[in-house]
């Protein structure tokens, strides 16, 4: 078997729960709930939901329609996908992960419109967060890693954002550590002030903030994320480099970029030649960034795929991988005391702690 590109403990900060579901679990709940899937075998299902050559972001987003109806609105399914997510990450050598999701996309009650063509049920976005928390906590105990969550606002649904920030407040440090904004980057916050208001409330209440920006959208979306939404981290951020002044400013601020190499190839976010990927620029400039999978189910990937791409095509060394993970830990949304513990674990695993030799 090919050896892993980086066989040491890792930290992952940008991965979507609803893009990380085991195909077997989708098939199980589709059968149980009598929901029709495009195929009823793992191989058949993956032919519809997974892909290996670049598609547009719209085509990528359509993949969720194939399987989310089997999971959304089912208590057992929601708990199980959170638990199995922790199991999956533990197997990849991750010791700390922040997983993100939209509570509204898994609900079927008190959500307008009800997603995925579901009939109205009795699972509210609030209960979704509680169910995910239960699954994550159970997974933490079983697999001995730390998992926290980030709740997503959706750019096309600003009416949900107030509730998202309220749920962040309610479950703050009960696995939930931050708020995110995901979706179509062309929908800006001037036209959709609901997001800005939610982020203002997050700032006021000490809730950490990340924003998907500059993935397929221009550098102006990154500028808005930093200046208007007061983002502490940027999801993707590849197109930041197109505005040299903004890029220089964010380097000086030590802004963290959540980089997803394989994802950026498959969504057409970046040039298909990895040697021209913004992450190579980030590496050369000693920027603050991490390596992440984004949506492993749809991209047919594990964290090792992203690390292998970085090693083979972007000139990454073991030392750079260590630096990337230390930066990820430093930029995590954990409370300071837990962050120190996490960093100590990494320093120890990377042989960076000098023995006192009694």
Swiss-Prot record:
PROSITE patterns: A_DEAMINASE. One of its GO terms (molecular function) is adenosine deaminase activity. It holds the Pfam family A_deaminase. The active site is at residue 215. It is found in: Cell membrane; Cell junction; Cytoplasmic vesicle lumen; Cytoplasm. Binds 1 zinc ion per subunit. Belongs to the metallo-dependent hydrolases superfamily. Adenosine and AMP deaminases family. It is an enzyme of class 3 (hydrolase). Zn(2+) binds at residues 14, 16, 212, 294. It catalyses: adenosine + H2O + H(+) = inosine + NH4(+); 2'-deoxyadenosine + H2O + H(+) = 2'-deoxyinosine + NH4(+). Its EC number is 3.5.4.4. It is a peripheral membrane protein. The lineage of its organism: Eukaryota, Metazoa, Chordata, Craniata, Vertebrata. Gene3D superfamilies: Metal-dependent hydrolases. The record marks 236 as: Important for catalytic activity. Catalyzes the hydrolytic deamination of adenosine and 2-deoxyadenosine. Plays an important role in purine metabolism and in adenosine homeostasis. Modulates signaling by extracellular adenosine, and so contributes indirectly to cellular signaling events. May act as a positive regulator of T-cell coactivation. SUPFAM superfamilies: Metallo-dependent hydrolases. Its cofactor is Zn(2+). The keyword Metal-binding applies. Substrate binds at residues 16, 18, 183, 295. NCBIfam families: aden_deam. This is Adenosine deaminase. GO terms for biological process: adenosine catabolic process; inosine biosynthetic process; nucleotide metabolic process; purine ribonucleoside monophosphate biosynthetic process. One of its GO terms (cellular component) is cytoplasmic vesicle lumen.
């Amino acid at each position: 078997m090919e050896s892993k590109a980086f066989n040491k403990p890792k930290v992952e900060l940008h991965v979507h729960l609803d893009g990380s579901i085991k195909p077997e679990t989708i098939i199980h709940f589709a059968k149980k709930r009598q929901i029709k899937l495009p195929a009823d075998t793992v191989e058949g299902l993956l032919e519809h939901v997974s892909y290996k050559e670049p598609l547009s972001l719209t085509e990528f987003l359509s993949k969720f329609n194939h399987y989310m109806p089997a999971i959304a609105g089912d208590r057992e399914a929601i708990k199980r996908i959170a638990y199995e997510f922790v199991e999956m990450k533990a197997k990849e050598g991750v010791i700390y992960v922040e997983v993100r999701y939209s509570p509204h996309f898994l609900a079927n009650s008190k959500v307008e419109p009800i997603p995925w063509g579901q009939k109205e049920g009795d699972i509210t976005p609030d209960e979704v967060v509680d169910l995910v928390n239960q699954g994550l906590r159970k997974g933490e105990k079983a697999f001995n890693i730390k998992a926290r969550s980030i709740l997503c606002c959706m750019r096309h649904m600003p009416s949900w954002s107030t509730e998202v920030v309220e749920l962040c407040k309610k479950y703050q440090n009960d696995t939930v550590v931050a708020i995110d904004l995901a979706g179509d980057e062309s929908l800006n916050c001037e036209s959709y002030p609901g997001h800005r208001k939610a982020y203002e409330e997050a700032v006021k209440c000490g809730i950490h903030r990340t924003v998907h920006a500059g993935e397929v959208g221009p550098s102006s979306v990154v500028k808005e994320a930093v200046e208007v939404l007061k983002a502490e981290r940027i999801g993707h951020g590849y197109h930041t480099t197109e505005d040299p002044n903004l890029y220089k400013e964010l380097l000086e601020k030590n802004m963290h970029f959540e980089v997803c190499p394989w994802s950026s190839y498959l969504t057409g976010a970046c040039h298909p030649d990895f040697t021209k990927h913004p992450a190579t620029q980030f590496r050369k400039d000693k920027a603050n960034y991490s390596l992440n999978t984004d949506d492993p189910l749809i991209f047919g990937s594990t964290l090792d795929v992203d690390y292998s791409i970085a090693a083979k095509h972007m000139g990454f060394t073991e030392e750079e991988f260590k630096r990337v993970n230390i930066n990820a830990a430093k930029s995590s949304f954990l409370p300071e005391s837990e962050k120190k513990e996490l960093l100590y674990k990494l320093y120890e695993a990377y042989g960076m702690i000098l023995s006192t030799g009694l």
